[in-house]
Amino acid sequence: MDYKEAGVDVEAGRAFVEKIRQNVESTFRPEVIGGLGGFGGYFQLPSGYRQPVLVSGTDGVGTKLKIAHSLNCHDTVGIDLVAMCVNDVLTSGAEPLFFLDYLATGKLEASQLAAVVSGIARACRDSGCTLLGGETAEMPGFYSAGEYDLAGFCVGIVEKSQLLDGSKVQIGDVAIGLASSGVHSNGFSLVRKIIDTQGLNWQDCPEILAGSSLGEVLLTPTRLYVKPVLELLRSGLDIHAMAHITGGGIPENLPRCLGKGHSVQIYCESWPVLPIFHWLAQMGSVNAEAMFNTFNMGIGFVIIVPSDLARSTINQLQSSGINAYQIGEVIAGKGEIVGLD
C-alpha cells in the first residue's frame, strides 16, 4: 500500500502546481524575489517608507462555497476570497502587498481547483497584490467528493503616520457608503436556509431579479475596493476612517472604525437596497433588524470624511466606477449605529 492508494496523489499535486504556475506568476509585483516552489515566498518591502507598518488579515468565503459546489461554478469564489482579505487590510489605509491561499479538498480535481486559483489570481491582479504562495491539501475522508474549503491571508503596508485607527474621527464627519455588488460573502447560511425552506433551487429566476437566476445573483463575487480607495488616499483626501461591511452588517462593522465617544446616525433611505435583499427579506420573513445584522444591504464599504469633503469624495469614487452615497453622520455616543429601525 502507498500514499496514492490511501487517497493522496503527490504527483497530481505537483502537476497542479505547474498547471497554475503561469496564472500565479502573472500577479507578481517587482518586489517578489524568486518564484514558486520554495518553503516560503520572498517579498522585498517597497522603498520610500520612513516608518512602514505591516497590516495583516485573514478570512474565508464561508458557506457560499456550497452554491459553487452545487452549480459546479468555481471561477468566482477565488475573487471572493481575495476581496474578503484585501478589503479588510485596506481599512487601515494600507496597500495590499501579497496574498497567500489555503485550499483543502477531499480529492484534487485539477480543472476545478485551477478555476478557483484563476479567480484568486484575477482578483490579485485587480488589487495590485502578489499571489505569493499557497497550500493545496488533499484530505481524503474529510471532505465530500467535489467539495473544498478556502482560506486567504493578506499582508499590506502603510506609513505609520497615515495609519487609520479611528483617532481622526470627529463629530460631524460624514459616512460615505460604497455600493456592494450583491450579498458578497456573508449571510449564506441564512440564504441557504431560506432557499431550502421554500423548496427552491439555484436555477430559479424570481421576477424581482429581472431574468437572472438565484445562483447567478448569489455567486456574484465580492466587490474589490482597493483601486478606487487607494486612488482617494493617494490624492491626499483627508480620510478619517474606513470600514469593510462583512458579517454582522453595518451595525457590527461600522463601530469598529470609530474610536471612543462616537456613534453614527444612518439614513436608510439614502441608498438603493438591491433587489436580492428585498427578495430574501420577503421569502424568509426576515425583519429589518435581522437583515441589517446579517447582510451588507447594498453597502459594502464605508469611508468617514469631514463633511466638506463629502461631495468630492463621492465624485471621485463615481469617476472610478463605484456608486457612492452619503449614508450618515458621526454623532456623540458609545459606538451605536442609530437609525436602522
From Swiss-Prot:
GO biological processes: 'de novo' IMP biosynthetic process; adenine biosynthetic process
Keyword Ligase applies: yes
One protein family per Pfam: AIRS_C
InterPro entries for this protein: PurM-like_C_dom, PurM-like_C_sf, PurM-like_N, PurM-like_N_sf, PurM_cligase
Any one GO MF annotation of this record: phosphoribosylamine-glycine ligase activity
Compartments (UniProt record): Cytoplasm
GO cellular component: cytosol
Principal localisation: cytoplasm
Record keyword Membrane present: no
Leading EC class: ligase
Reactions mediated catalytically: 2-formamido-N(1)-(5-O-phospho-beta-D-ribosyl)acetamidine + ATP = 5-amino-1-(5-phospho-beta-D-ribosyl)imidazole + ADP + phosphate + H(+)
Name of this chain's protein: Phosphoribosylformylglycinamidine cyclo-ligase
